[in-house]
Amino acid sequence: MSTASFHLDTNLINDANNLKFGIVVSSWNNNITDDLLEGCLKVLYSNNVPESNIQIINVPGSFELVYGCKIMQEKEVDVVIAIGCVIKGETKHFDFICNATSNGIKDLNVNGNCPVIFCVLTDNTLEQSIARSGGKFGN
């Protein structure tokens, strides 16, 4: 299902200059996650979030996003953004990583002290990930 018609209207976002953001980025598939981070920062900057209110940490892969987000929640930020990309391969590894990551982030939302935004692509192909990280479906 295409999400192209559901792009965020950034004009509807309130001024966020007083909010502190923690961003946790997976280094795995960094050609995709770097573009997702760029899009995320563009939205934050366009809504008056100063660079000094943004902390970024990198983790090895999407599985480690949960740990990174937990650490970030402890840094007294207002919101955490988890950025990752899992691309399906030939084994069940994709399913295990996607399930563990999504459930872990859900648990942080239920039990943590601030929301964690799920910006993790779970695509069948590299082409799908490219299309969703600044490609034809935006960022």
Short names for language-model regions:
Residues M1-K20, K136-N139:
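N-terminal presequence-like segments and the immediate start of the first folded domain
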Residues N11-I56:
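Glycine-rich phosphate/diphosphate-binding loop of Rossmann-like nucleotide-binding domains
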Residues N18-L19, K75-D78, N111-I117:
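Short coil/turn connectors at secondary-structure junctions
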Residues W28, C85-V86, L121-T125:
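Short, ordered loop/turn segments at secondary-structure junctions
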Residues N30, D34, E38, V59-F63, ...:
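Electropositive phosphate-/nucleotide-binding environments in soluble metabolic enzymes
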Residues S46-K75:
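Active-site rim loops that border cofactor/substrate pockets in soluble metabolic enzymes
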Residues E64-I105:
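Glycine-rich phosphate-binding loop
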Residues F94-D95, N99-N139:
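C-terminal binding/interaction regions
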